[in-house]
Amino acid sequence: DGDIYKTGLYVKDSITGTGTLSYIDPETKIFGALGHEIIESNTSNIVEIKTGTIFRNYITSIDKSRVGYAGSKNAKFYYNTKYGSIMKNTGVGIYGLYESTIPNKEMLEVATKEEIKIGSAKIATVLNKEEVKYYDIEINKIDETAKIKNISFKITDKELLDKTGGVVQGMSGSPIMQNGKIIGAVTHVIIDNPTIGYGLFITTMLDEGEK
C-alpha cells in the first residue's frame, strides 16, 4: 500500500504442554523438569514465565516417532490437581516449588559427572495413564563440555521402541539412571533417527534449581 507501513501484534497469555518431572529435592521441595527451556511454537522464542503451574496429567495415547517426525505423548490434564508452582524457565529446564505431598518413593543418589560411564542405563517415563516404567538404553557418548547435550544414548528396549518408535515429545525431563543413581534427564531427540536421544547432567539441573 505505497508508503503505508503495517505492523502486527502477537499476544498470548498462556501456554500448556506435556513434559516430565525430573526430580524433587525432598529437603527444599525444589523441583526440576524438562531439561530444556519452554519455547513458544509460533515465534520460537523462549517463554518468559511470570507464573506457572505443574498439574497432574494422564497419558491417553502415544503418537509414534519415525524418521523425520518426532512423535508425542498425548495427555489429559487435571487442572484441579496442582502439584507445584513454576518459578523460572531456563535453557536447562523449568524449576519451581513442589507444593503437594511428596510421593513415598525410594530416593536415588546423585551421580557425579565422573561416575557416568559408556554402557547400559535406564530411563524412567510414563507411556500409559500414570504408570512409571523403566526402559533400557545404551549410553554411547559423554560430553562434559556441552551445555545440555552431555549424554548421547540409543534406546535398546524393545517394548519402548514398539510403543513409541523412539524418543517422543513429552519424554523431555525423563530421569536417566545408571548403577542405581540418577545421572541426568532426557532433553532432545535426533529427528533423522528417533531411537537416538540426548540428556543433560542431573548435577546441572540441581545447580540451576538452587540458584
Predicted regions mapped to residue ranges:
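C-terminal recognition in membrane/secretory proteostasis and scaffolding
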Residues: 1-211
